[in-house]
Swiss-Prot record:
Belongs to the RecR family. HAMAP family: RecR. It comes from Ruminiclostridium cellulolyticum (strain ATCC 35319 / DSM 5812 / JCM 6584 / H10). May play a role in DNA repair. It seems to be involved in an RecBC-independent recombinational process of DNA repair. It may act with RecF and RecO. A zinc finger (C4-type) spans 58-73. This is Recombination protein RecR. GO terms for molecular function: DNA binding; zinc ion binding. GO terms for biological process: DNA recombination; DNA repair. The gene is recR.
């Protein structure tokens, strides 16, 4: 039995539906919102509604945007001969934070996972192949996650694009910067050895 008002209990319940938010965190968030001044609560609710209403998928790369095509696709300074394929819009943010990649992106919104009933048709592979039909793209960097689903997706895509004459590369996996070899598992060490480069 909960010891607080029904509207607070409803708010806790809604917060708990968010990923990574358990009961205690949901309770903390609910009480924080209740204690905010009314104008801050209003701003928060307006921001949530605006984000939901105005955000859509870019018609070119499938990234989240409020402008179509997105600024990355319409930017004139990007290298349009290279596309980095990622699973999730958050991966684009991570790649952009490195300030190293200057090409374009393609967001799949998932990975092939037969165990979860997700096949190639359920993610945006067809749209990628359509983009490659223009002939402008010379390389596709497969930056899917380094797990079974990500590897399967990368292999599937590489086989599809090989006949198109587009170079397929895979991001290297291995030891994180500052990590100790003794704590790395065998798979990570093997991937680090595979992905080694000349210095």
């Amino acid at each position: 039995m909960e010891y607080y008002a029904v509207p607070i209990a409803k708010l806790v319940e809604e917060f708990q539906k968010l990923p990574g938010i358990g009961h205690k965190s949901a309770q903390r968030l609910a009480f924080h919102v209740i204690n905010l001044p009314m104008e801050k609560v209003q701003k928060l609710s307006e921001s949530i509604l605006e984000a939901k209403q105005k955000t859509r998928y870019c018609s070119v790369c499938s990234n989240l945007t409020d402008i179509d095509p997105c600024p990355l696709c319409s930017g004139t300074s990007r290298d349009k001969t290279v596309i980095c394929v990622v699973q999730d819009p958050r991966d684009v943010v991570a790649m952009e934070r490195t300030r190293e990649f200057k090409g374009l992106y393609h967001v799949l919104h998932g990975a092939i996972s037969p165990m979860q009933g997700i096949g190639p048709e359920e993610i945006r592979i067809k749209e990628l192949i359509t983009r490659l039909g223009s002939g402008d793209v010379k390389e596709v960097i497969l930056a899917t996650n380094p797990n079974v689903e990500g590897e399967a997706t990368a292999m599937y895509i590489s086989k599809l694009i090989k006949p198109l004459g587009v170079k397929a590369t895979r991001i290297a996996h291995g030891i994180p910067v500052g990590g100790d070899l003794e704590y790395a598992d065998e798979v990570t060490l093997a991937k680090a050895l595979e992905g080694r480069r000349e210095i």
